[in-house]
Amino acid sequence: IVGGVEAVPNSWPHQAALFIDDMYFCGGSLISPEWILTAAHCMDGAGFVDVVLGAHNIREDEATQVTIQSTDFTVHENYNSFVISNDIAVIRLPVPVTLTAAIATVGLPSTDVGVGTVVTPTGWGLPSDSALGISDVLRQVDVPIMSNADCDAVYGIVTDGNICIDSTGGKGTCNGDSGGPLNYNGLTYGITSFGAAAGCEAGYPDAFTRVTYFLDWIQTQTGITP
């Protein structure tokens, strides 16, 4: 997250940290005690994932943290890495996690938020373009929803399955935030998907997978509904 602030510890208790094949880092959202929602580009081709829940400082072994390894995940069957479409995946935990003050599920929205609504992506991704690694602590930033038309004018690959934010002023998501939630009013409206190659602080829009567009897919895979 660039241009943001450190989150209050455990204030986003659905936020998951994903260590994929001991090589890649992503975020995710706990949508039930046994299911994590994340991005396809995080899980495509993966062998296993260590899911960390209840974390704030990801580089410390906090008492609130629970780590569960999973090899059971489903990437959307029509995920296309070239145009970054259908960028959604779910991970099934082998044992349902015990919910605590620091570990909770997040709801899915049944309707969308309008353009201009201020929403909050969260994650441990790079805190600046010059950062050498992911953030130690969970970070957040408040940003407005922008229209898909304006977003597509920049990228040319934005579809109804996306929702975008205006990152003017260098506020938005960055490498390592992928798969994490776009939070608003206690629900997650998006899955962090892609941004501009020019850099996270360059002010170009950030694109997310639009959760409402994939509600049927999520229900088919997990049985979970809004």
UniProtKB/Swiss-Prot annotation:
UniProt-listed SUPFAM superfamilies: Trypsin-like serine proteases
Top-level taxon of the source organism: Eukaryota
GO MF term list: serine-type endopeptidase activity
Keywords: Collagen degradation, Disulfide bond, Hydrolase, Protease, Serine protease
InterPro entries given in the database record: Peptidase_S1, Peptidase_S1_PA, Peptidase_S1_PA_chymotrypsin, Peptidase_S1A, Trypsin_dom, TRYPSIN_HIS, TRYPSIN_SER
Any Pfam family matching the protein: Trypsin
Keyword Iron: no
Peptidase S1 domain ranges (all copies): 1-223
Cystine residue pairs: C26-C42, C151-C164, C174-C200
EC number: 3.4.21.32
GO annotation, biological process: collagen catabolic process; proteolysis
Keyword RNA-binding: no
Residue positions of the active site: H41 (charge relay system), D87 (charge relay system), S178 (charge relay system)
Catalytic activity: Hydrolysis of proteins, with broad specificity for peptide bonds. Native collagen is cleaved about 75% of the length of the molecule from the N-terminus. Low activity on small molecule substrates of both trypsin and chymotrypsin
Family: Belongs to the peptidase S1 family.
Main function: This enzyme is a serine protease capable of degrading the native triple helix of collagen.
Name of the protein: Brachyurin
Species per Swiss-Prot/TrEMBL record: Leptuca pugilator (Atlantic sand fiddler crab)
